[in-house]
Amino acid sequence: MIIGIPKEILSGENRIGITPVTVKELVKKEFEVLIESNSGSGSFIDDSSYQDAGAKIVNDSKKIYQEADIIVKVNPPLNEELELLKNDSMLLSFLQPTKELELVKSINNKKITGFSLHLIPRTTLAQKMDALSSQTNIAGYRAVLMGAMHIKKYMPLLMTAAGTIKPAKVLVIGAG
């Protein structure tokens, strides 16, 4: 069975659906993994890391869509990607089926089996497939850093021989 990872084409998206560690595990289980060249560059993962893990680097995303039985993406496929998906394949992604009804209809019409990663239960049994927790954890961390950039005061307590600066007081609203 062939697993394909095309490069994310949504503007500003730097993530990739599979890391080299996962590729290595899949190859051990006798999957063939095709990854579009430079797919991991936004996440600072070069092609050689994927090759070392056993993936084949492909220069053309169309080839990946034509050959793969399973496509792994971060974002739901855009229309041009959806057209490339072959009938009776599988798609793993943050599909957002409650927001993307037309996408769900298109996937259904092509007899594609879709797995929406953010809807996998966050339980012990499904923990290895819990992609949402890692993403919300990173988003929350980044939100704090971005918020800190807008504070006109020094964030942590600073004690030096020259004096003490009290830490900023902030209120964080939300959970993720």
Sequence positions of predicted segments:
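Glycine/serine-rich phosphate-binding loop and adjoining beta1-alpha1 elements at the start
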Residues: I2, N79-K169, I173
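An N-terminal-biased, well-structured beta-alpha scaffold segment characteristic
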Residues: I2-I112
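Active-site donor-nucleotide binding/catalytic segment of nucleotide-sugar enzymes
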Residues: G176
